[in-house]
Amino acid sequence: MAGHSKWANIKHRKASQDAKRGKIFTKLIREITVAAKNGALPEDNPRLRAVIDKALTVNMKKDTIEKAIQRGAGGGDDSNFDELTYEGYGPGGVAVYVEVMTDNRNRTVAEVRHAFSKHGGNLGTDGSVAYLFSKTGVILFAPDVDEDAVMEAALEAGAQDVIANDDGSVEVQTSAEDFMAVKDALMAAGLTPESADVSMVPATMAPLDVENGEKVMKLIEMLEDLDDVQNVYSNADIPDEVLESMGG
């Protein structure tokens, strides 16, 4: 399960770095706007509720959240974003899966293709790597959590798996459909996660040497820096020394 630990760490590290740059706010506002098109009430719109929770976790003001909801629910031109995915291969043959929200498909595909090309990868066709991932709820707890308490509450609530990571953190995995119910049950048990999201989890990891590990990290960071990109997932098993040298 070491690969899962590294994968979770990469996602968490990037979330922290994005917050410092302010980019995560822009991405979350866009996600709230899109989610609100299916209903402005979080209690009736699980997707909206999930992204509001993420926004509150990074200390977004409620006024900012409310404005994004109103913009999406109002259906104006400034809320017309297409949700797309791009798939490709990075250095060492690793699979890369990119989720975007865009108001200009031509601009976005050009930027994504450029990022792959610049860092030794190539953009593939639809379906080329998606089969290597599964849509999974991932609820991550810090290393000081009571592992037994998490396991008991999670399994009772219908979680698929509870993983004790090498770094001491505990990862709860759920089906996408059960994600909010399991998260709510854990919160009700007094267990507050470090992060919680529905993600694309790789079935197996692809080990990399240091050189390719550095290239893949640069590719992922360039993709995540693009305004239209919401999430980047990879099955890359990055060497520890690369993670440490890049602030992991």
UniProtKB/Swiss-Prot annotation:
It is found in: Cytoplasm. The keyword Transcription regulation applies. Keywords: Cytoplasm, DNA-binding, Transcription, Transcription regulation. Its main location: cytoplasm. GO terms for biological process: regulation of DNA-templated transcription. The keyword RNA-binding does not apply. It comes from the Bacteria. GO terms for molecular function: DNA binding. GO terms for cellular component: cytosol. Belongs to the TACO1 family. NCBIfam families: PRK00110.1, PRK12378.1, YebC/PmpR family DNA-binding transcriptional regulator. This is Probable transcriptional regulatory protein HCH_04926.
